[in-house]
From Swiss-Prot:
Component of the COP9 signalosome (CSN) complex. This is COP9 signalosome complex subunit 5. The keyword NAD does not apply. It comes from Aspergillus fumigatus (strain ATCC MYA-4609 / CBS 101355 / FGSC A1100 / Af293). One of its GO terms (cellular component) is cytoplasm. The gene is csn5. GO terms for molecular function: deNEDDylase activity; metal ion binding; metallopeptidase activity. A motif (JAMM motif) lies at residues 134-147.
Length: 334
């Protein structure tokens, strides 16, 4: 059980904050007011470069995203800002109407948000809402056209960050698939990226157009996680509750629908690439030494294979560990 918890923390690089330096959990009102007055992000579209998320907030968001299944979910993150950094100390879900492709915050959600934040302040927790999160079940961490519009509106009121979690890829890979983003001002044209391969991720064919149309309107922040001595105790209690499910479940069965969709999407990409090669060959076009489209397809296939192999190895290890347990008791009873 403890090994499973430590493995999860190592996979997601969650660092322990020294109890004497738990300042990340203490809201610094003076620093927050000074930054809000100076508004350095208004002059530099890339001002915010990183986001630090507490382990408990990460678990809350991940479990919420997982509970939505194939439907998108949405919530808010509480915290504060430091120079060039968002600090997220907690998160809470919103009662919103979600579909498989979008999530819409209605009037009920807005009323709930205001009421919840006021209740937190009444209880002495002065952290502000610094961002919103939502899920992309099975199609990666990026901002769609609707997400970009939502983030643009939120940034008008001050510093705000958008976080996206893919619950299906999280279960399949064994590591939280998460991304944090901020949009650029309308009158700003970002410089072209030097190496797009570094930020490459698998995008389903049905989402490729939406992804490409808005990818230049936002940038990603570096995401890291932290925990305090209190978080260590809370995580221990959570693992006491869920360690049986961790051992009994297999990603091969939990995400088999997701795996099937990934293979189907890959086959469609291969067929499209083959048609493109045939048409270029019939026109007598010159062949390029490196076909970027085919290279991406190969990388997609390698990722699917690695996740399937990882699931098979995990199942094999569990079988070796638990095979034969209980047989001696049954033999003695007979």
């Amino acid at each position: 059980m403890q090994a499973a918890q430590q493995s999860w923390e190592l996979e997601n690089t969650i660092s322990l904050i020294d109890p004497q330096r738990d300042a990340l959990y203490r809201y610094d009102e003076e620093t927050h007011k000074a930054l809000s007055a100076a508004r350095p992000w208004a002059k530099d579209p890339h001002y915010f470069k990183s986001i630090r998320i507490s382990a408990v907030a990460l678990i809350k968001m991940t479990m919420h995203a997982r509970s939505g299944g194939s439907l998108e979910v949405m919530g808010l993150m509480q915290g504060y800002i430091l120079p060039e950094t968002f600090v997220v100390t907690d998160a809470f879900r919103l009662p919103v109407e979600g579909t498989e492709t979008r999530v819409n915050a209605q009037e009920e959600a807005n009323e709930y948000m205001v009421s919840y934040l006021q209740s937190c302040r009444d209880a002495g927790r002065m952290e502000n809402a610094v961002g919103w999160y939502h899920s992309h079940p099975g199609y990666g961490c990026w901002l769609s056209g609707i997400d970009v519009t939502t983030q643009d509106m939120q940034q008008l009121g001050g510093p705000f960050v958008a976080v996206v979690i893919d619950p299906e890829r999280t279960i399949s890979a064994g590591k939280v698939d998460i991304g944090a983003f901020r949009t650029f001002p309308k009158d700003y044209t970002p410089p072209k990226e030097g190496n797009e391969d570094e930020d490459y991720q698998t995008i389903p064919l049905s989402k490729a157009e939406d992804f490409g149309a808005y990818a230049h309107q936002y940038y990603s922040l570096e995401v890291s996680f932290f925990k305090s001595s209190l978080d260590t105790e809370l995580l221990s209690q959570l693992w006491n509750k869920y360690w049986v499910a961790t051992l009994s479940q297999s990603p091969l069965f939990t995400t088999r629908d997701y795996g099937s969709r990934q293979m189907m999407d890959l086959s469609q990409k291969v067929r499209r690439a083959a048609r493109g090669i045939e048409s270029s060959g019939s026109r007598g076009g010159a062949t390029t030494p490196k076909d970027q489209q085919l290279e991406k397809i190969v990388r997609d296939g390698q990722r699917i294979v690695s996740e399937e192999v990882k699931g098979l190895l995990a199942a094999e290890v569990k079988m070796k560990l638990f095979q034969g347990i209980g047989e001696g008791t049954q033999t003695g009873a007979s």
